[in-house]
Regions:
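Phosphate-binding loop of NTP-binding sites
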Residues: 1-124, 134-141, 145-146
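Adenine nucleotide phosphate-binding catalytic loops in nucleotide-utilizing enzymes
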Residues: 121-177
Protein backbone atom coordinates (compact mmCIF):
# COMPACT_ATOMS: atom_id res chain seq x y z
CA UNK A 1 0.00 0.00 0.00
CA UNK A 2 2.86 2.38 0.80
CA UNK A 3 4.62 1.65 -2.50
CA UNK A 4 1.37 2.24 -4.39
CA UNK A 5 0.71 5.53 -2.58
CA UNK A 6 4.25 6.83 -3.17
CA UNK A 7 4.18 5.84 -6.85
CA UNK A 8 0.78 7.48 -7.36
CA UNK A 9 2.02 10.67 -5.70
CA UNK A 10 5.03 10.91 -8.00
CA UNK A 11 3.09 10.09 -11.18
CA UNK A 12 0.23 12.44 -10.29
CA UNK A 13 2.67 15.37 -10.18
CA UNK A 14 4.01 14.48 -13.62
CA UNK A 15 0.85 13.30 -15.42
CA UNK A 16 -2.21 14.50 -13.52
CA UNK A 17 -5.04 12.11 -12.74
CA UNK A 18 -4.01 8.51 -11.93
CA UNK A 19 -6.37 5.55 -11.63
CA UNK A 20 -5.65 3.78 -8.34
CA UNK A 21 -7.23 1.81 -5.52
CA UNK A 22 -6.16 3.67 -2.36
CA UNK A 23 -8.78 1.95 -0.20
CA UNK A 24 -6.97 -1.35 -0.65
CA UNK A 25 -9.74 -2.99 -2.69
CA UNK A 26 -7.21 -5.25 -4.40
CA UNK A 27 -9.28 -8.21 -5.60
CA UNK A 28 -11.13 -8.42 -8.91
CA UNK A 29 -14.31 -6.70 -7.65
CA UNK A 30 -12.31 -3.85 -6.15
CA UNK A 31 -10.19 -3.41 -9.27
CA UNK A 32 -13.34 -3.41 -11.42
CA UNK A 33 -14.91 -0.75 -9.17
CA UNK A 34 -11.73 1.31 -9.38
CA UNK A 35 -11.96 1.48 -13.18
CA UNK A 36 -15.73 2.08 -13.19
CA UNK A 37 -15.43 5.05 -10.84
CA UNK A 38 -12.25 6.54 -12.34
CA UNK A 39 -12.45 10.09 -13.64
CA UNK A 40 -11.98 10.50 -17.36
CA UNK A 41 -8.48 11.73 -18.13
CA UNK A 42 -8.30 15.05 -20.02
CA UNK A 43 -5.57 13.67 -22.26
CA UNK A 44 -7.60 10.58 -23.08
CA UNK A 45 -4.79 8.41 -21.75
CA UNK A 46 -5.16 6.66 -18.43
CA UNK A 47 -2.36 5.60 -16.16
CA UNK A 48 -3.28 3.07 -13.51
CA UNK A 49 -1.26 2.14 -10.45
CA UNK A 50 -2.94 -0.76 -8.73
CA UNK A 51 -2.17 -2.85 -5.70
CA UNK A 52 -3.43 -6.32 -6.60
CA UNK A 53 -3.95 -9.33 -4.36
CA UNK A 54 -1.56 -12.15 -5.24
CA UNK A 55 -4.26 -14.74 -6.00
CA UNK A 56 -6.29 -12.20 -8.00
CA UNK A 57 -3.46 -11.27 -10.36
CA UNK A 58 -3.95 -14.23 -12.76
CA UNK A 59 -7.66 -13.36 -13.06
CA UNK A 60 -7.10 -9.62 -13.46
CA UNK A 61 -4.44 -10.00 -16.16
CA UNK A 62 -7.05 -11.77 -18.27
CA UNK A 63 -8.80 -8.39 -18.60
CA UNK A 64 -6.07 -5.76 -18.39
CA UNK A 65 -2.57 -5.75 -19.84
CA UNK A 66 -0.09 -3.96 -17.59
CA UNK A 67 3.18 -2.60 -18.90
CA UNK A 68 4.96 -2.98 -15.55
CA UNK A 69 4.72 -5.18 -12.46
CA UNK A 70 6.48 -4.18 -9.23
CA UNK A 71 7.33 -7.03 -6.87
CA UNK A 72 8.28 -5.70 -3.43
CA UNK A 73 8.21 -8.60 -0.97
CA UNK A 74 6.58 -11.80 0.20
CA UNK A 75 6.95 -12.66 3.87
CA UNK A 76 5.89 -15.69 5.85
CA UNK A 77 3.36 -13.60 7.79
CA UNK A 78 1.28 -13.72 4.59
CA UNK A 79 1.00 -17.52 4.71
CA UNK A 80 -2.39 -17.45 6.41
CA UNK A 81 -3.95 -16.37 3.12
CA UNK A 82 -2.43 -18.68 0.51
CA UNK A 83 -0.10 -21.12 2.23
CA UNK A 84 3.63 -21.24 1.64
CA UNK A 85 5.44 -18.23 0.18
CA UNK A 86 6.47 -20.27 -2.85
CA UNK A 87 2.78 -20.87 -3.67
CA UNK A 88 2.09 -17.16 -3.35
CA UNK A 89 5.03 -16.33 -5.63
CA UNK A 90 3.81 -18.83 -8.23
CA UNK A 91 0.40 -17.11 -8.28
CA UNK A 92 2.13 -13.81 -8.99
CA UNK A 93 4.24 -15.36 -11.75
CA UNK A 94 1.15 -16.97 -13.31
CA UNK A 95 -0.49 -13.55 -13.48
CA UNK A 96 2.61 -11.85 -14.89
CA UNK A 97 3.00 -14.55 -17.55
CA UNK A 98 -0.36 -13.49 -19.01
CA UNK A 99 1.28 -10.16 -19.88
CA UNK A 100 4.66 -11.41 -21.17
CA UNK A 101 5.63 -8.02 -22.65
CA UNK A 102 5.31 -6.32 -19.24
CA UNK A 103 8.54 -5.73 -17.37
CA UNK A 104 8.88 -7.07 -13.85
CA UNK A 105 10.63 -4.65 -11.51
CA UNK A 106 11.60 -6.95 -8.66
CA UNK A 107 13.24 -6.44 -5.30
CA UNK A 108 16.65 -8.02 -5.87
CA UNK A 109 17.15 -8.22 -2.10
CA UNK A 110 14.49 -10.96 -2.01
CA UNK A 111 15.92 -14.37 -2.92
CA UNK A 112 12.44 -15.49 -3.91
CA UNK A 113 12.19 -12.98 -6.77
CA UNK A 114 15.51 -14.19 -8.17
CA UNK A 115 14.65 -17.88 -7.87
CA UNK A 116 12.86 -18.74 -11.14
CA UNK A 117 13.18 -18.07 -14.82
CA UNK A 118 10.24 -16.00 -16.08
CA UNK A 119 8.89 -15.11 -19.52
CA UNK A 120 8.82 -11.38 -18.75
CA UNK A 121 11.78 -9.03 -18.94
CA UNK A 122 13.09 -8.47 -15.40
CA UNK A 123 14.90 -5.56 -13.78
CA UNK A 124 16.06 -5.68 -10.17
CA UNK A 125 16.31 -2.96 -7.55
CA UNK A 126 17.71 -3.11 -4.03
CA UNK A 127 20.03 -1.60 -1.49
CA UNK A 128 23.62 -0.98 -2.55
CA UNK A 129 25.55 -1.86 0.57
CA UNK A 130 29.08 -2.49 1.70
CA UNK A 131 30.19 -6.06 1.20
CA UNK A 132 30.65 -8.15 4.33
CA UNK A 133 31.71 -11.76 4.82
CA UNK A 134 28.75 -14.12 4.40
CA UNK A 135 27.25 -15.44 7.62
CA UNK A 136 24.17 -17.29 8.71
CA UNK A 137 21.30 -14.92 9.29
CA UNK A 138 19.94 -14.24 12.77
CA UNK A 139 17.68 -17.01 14.13
CA UNK A 140 14.67 -14.71 13.75
CA UNK A 141 15.23 -14.36 10.02
CA UNK A 142 12.86 -16.18 7.70
CA UNK A 143 15.05 -19.01 6.48
CA UNK A 144 15.20 -19.22 2.73
CA UNK A 145 16.91 -22.10 1.01
CA UNK A 146 18.82 -21.80 -2.21
CA UNK A 147 16.47 -22.47 -5.13
CA UNK A 148 19.27 -24.24 -7.02
CA UNK A 149 20.75 -26.59 -4.41
CA UNK A 150 18.49 -26.21 -1.33
CA UNK A 151 21.34 -25.16 1.00
CA UNK A 152 20.59 -22.49 3.58
CA UNK A 153 21.40 -19.06 2.17
CA UNK A 154 23.87 -16.85 3.94
CA UNK A 155 23.85 -13.06 4.01
CA UNK A 156 26.58 -10.48 3.57
CA UNK A 157 24.01 -8.08 4.97
CA UNK A 158 20.51 -8.92 6.18
CA UNK A 159 18.26 -5.85 6.04
CA UNK A 160 14.92 -7.33 7.17
CA UNK A 161 13.34 -10.81 7.39
CA UNK A 162 14.59 -12.64 4.27
CA UNK A 163 15.81 -9.49 2.48
CA UNK A 164 19.42 -8.53 1.95
CA UNK A 165 22.63 -9.35 0.15
CA UNK A 166 22.30 -13.14 0.04
CA UNK A 167 24.65 -15.78 -1.30
CA UNK A 168 24.75 -19.56 -1.45
CA UNK A 169 28.17 -20.89 -0.49
CA UNK A 170 27.35 -24.25 -2.05
CA UNK A 171 26.64 -23.06 -5.62
CA UNK A 172 26.66 -19.82 -7.65
CA UNK A 173 23.25 -18.44 -6.57
CA UNK A 174 23.49 -14.88 -5.24
CA UNK A 175 21.76 -11.52 -5.16
CA UNK A 176 21.69 -9.88 -8.60
CA UNK A 177 23.99 -6.89 -9.06
Amino acid sequence: TLTTALTVGILKEAFGEIVTNPSGANMITGITSTFLTAKKAKSGKKIAVLEIDEASLPKITEYITPSLFVFTNIFRDQMDRYGEIYTTYQMILDGAAKAPEATILANGDSPLFNSKEVVNPVRFYGFDTEKHDPELAHYNTEGIVCPKCESILQYRLNTYANLGDYVCLNCDFHRPE
